[in-house]
């Protein structure tokens, strides 16, 4: 008897499946043409940019009817946003984390300003 092969999360996760859809690919490219730049840094969008959902509600994940709920981010900006805000399962104290990063940058300024 063959063992039962379980489907991986990538094969069953509705978010992953939606991001593989033609509808998402078309929407993503349309948003890239409109926004052109990383929302955080202002840098031109890289090939592997992320179209970030501002609404983390899983029930609304595939609702692309309101373009204002999405921003284009390059990968580093996307990682930083999720580091500060959370990952959809957990929410962090982003204001505290952002304050700590600001303090760190100010310290670096002190050590590096001539």
Q: What does each of the following model-derived ranges do?
A:
Residues 23-35, 63-67:
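Short, flexible, mixed-charge glycine/proline-rich loop motifs
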Residues 40-72, 81, 85, 91-92:
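Histidine-centered nuclease catalytic patch
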Residues 34-37, 70, 101:
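Secretory pathway export signals and precursors
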């Amino acid at each position: 008897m063959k063992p039962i092969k379980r489907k991986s999360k990538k094969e069953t996760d509705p978010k992953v499946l939606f991001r593989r859809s033609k509808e998402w690919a078309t929407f993503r490219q349309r948003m890239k043409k409109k926004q052109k730049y990383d929302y955080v840094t202002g840098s031109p969008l890289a090939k592997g940019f992320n179209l970030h959902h501002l609404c983390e509600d899983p029930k609304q994940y595939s609702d692309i009817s309101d373009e204002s709920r999405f921003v284009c981010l390059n990968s580093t900006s996307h990682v930083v946003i999720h580091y500060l805000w959370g990952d959809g399962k957990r929410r962090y104290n982003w204001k505290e984390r952002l304050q700590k990063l600001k303090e760190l940058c100010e310290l670096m300024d002190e050590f590096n300003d001539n």
